[in-house]
Amino acid sequence: MVLGKVKSLTISFDCLNDSNVPVYSSGDTVSGRVNLEVTGEIRVKSLKIHARGHAKVRWTESRNAGSNTAYTQNYTEEVEYFNHKDILIGHERDDDNCEEGFSTIHSGRHEYAFSFELPQTPLATSFEGRHGSVRYWVKAELHRPWLLPVKLKKEFTVFEHIDINTPSLLSPQAGTKEKTLCCWFCTSGPISLSAKIERKGYTPGESIQIFAEIENCSSRMVVPKAAIYQTQAFYAKGKMKEVKQLVANLRGESLSSGKTETWDGKLLKIPPVSPSILDCSIIRVEYSLMVYVDIPGAMDLLLSLPLVIGTIPLHPFGSRTSSVSSQCSMNMNWLGLSLPERPEAPPSYAEVVTEEQRRNNLAPVSACDDFERALQGPLFAYIQEFRFLPPPLYSEIDPNPDQSSEDRPSCPSR
């Protein structure tokens, strides 16, 4: 008898949303099929699936142990959210010499259904960062006697829903800052900045209306600007590693001495980025809106307003939808492309992004005085769910400047 061959082994998910992307939340049932195509008859010991969800953090730091001694310190941490195994065909027996229990699969295409329930407890949103990731996947393993197993892994996306309609995320965010410039024994007038946004919570694709007033009573030319930043924080062995990513920005008009500029709802659009991750013990993803004044030859005047990027968009006034899935479906279109099937081990960050790309796209910001330098870098943080989409293009110059605000002298004469 001529034994057949395995032509293909694939995994497909039953999607719960209109965009046909496998996206789930805690408590959902993940279901799908393992698709097997064979040419000729084959004998099978077992067809298994293994589903797992986990967050993992890893980075290294160089240490000096003496004048001529150095070593590398590894920091790793992992949190497992679920671990499910099931046998679709056959049994666990590993003895190839035992003829009993082998299954015969005939030539053609075959489907084997699987399903499992995600935990009811909160799950971290799928994410791929500089020093860690949150991944969810299903692996299929086909075991045959006297042959190496055929394995395939496919990821799916999990969103831990954040409803921006909660009172804490609907509250306005505001602040005021002032700075006086000094040069030797001379002191110029102050530069003042006040800014306000209507709420704390937003979803990708929305535009933030920025209300601000910038008053320049110094002797220098200054430029008001705004930027959205993503902060990734990774925790392991009592240590923390932080990376800041620039997401989007805009620039106002230059202000000469004695001038004032008012932003009456200047718009800054949020590109497709990962939602905030606030409930994971080893990975945290937060966002902030930086409204600041670029001052040549001095530290920038910075005002930071916290943001939360959610998954359930703002309800129109007076209307409520009936379910979380329907609320979230309108926000799934920007997922765009499904995650590909993978070999057994998911690719590392370094395998997906070259070292040169990583240096260019993930420039960290270490301090406020590096803020302007960071604004010259790329404007899109690397996110796993959206890594197959081209990065959005943004200009530092606002394409729709507010023409209503005019420079006007407002500082007291000196």
UniProtKB/Swiss-Prot annotation:
Motif PPxY motif 2: positions: 391-394
Residue numbers spanned by region Disordered: 393-414
InterPro entries according to UniProt: Arrestin-like_C, Arrestin-like_N, Arrestin_C-like, Arrestin_domain-protein, Ig_E-set
Topology term for the membrane: Peripheral membrane protein
Subcellular location: Cytoplasm; Cell membrane; Lysosome; Endosome
Disulphide bonds in the chain: none
Matches recorded under Gene3D superfamilies: 2.60.40.640
GO biological process, any: negative regulation of heat generation
Biased composition (Basic and acidic residues): 405-414
Positions occupied by motif PPxY motif 1: 346-349
One GO CC term, this protein: cytoplasm
Keyword terms, alphabetized: Cell membrane, Cytoplasm, Endosome, Lysosome, Membrane, Repeat
Primary role: Adapter protein that plays a role in regulating cell-surface expression of adrenergic receptors and probably also other G protein-coupled receptors. Plays a role in NEDD4-mediated ubiquitination and endocytosis af activated ADRB2 and subsequent ADRB2 degradation. May recruit NEDD4 to ADRB2. Alternatively, may function as adapter protein that does not play a major role in recruiting NEDD4 to ADRB2, but rather plays a role in a targeting ADRB2 to endosomes.
Family that this chain belongs to: Belongs to the arrestin family.
Protein name: Arrestin domain-containing protein 3
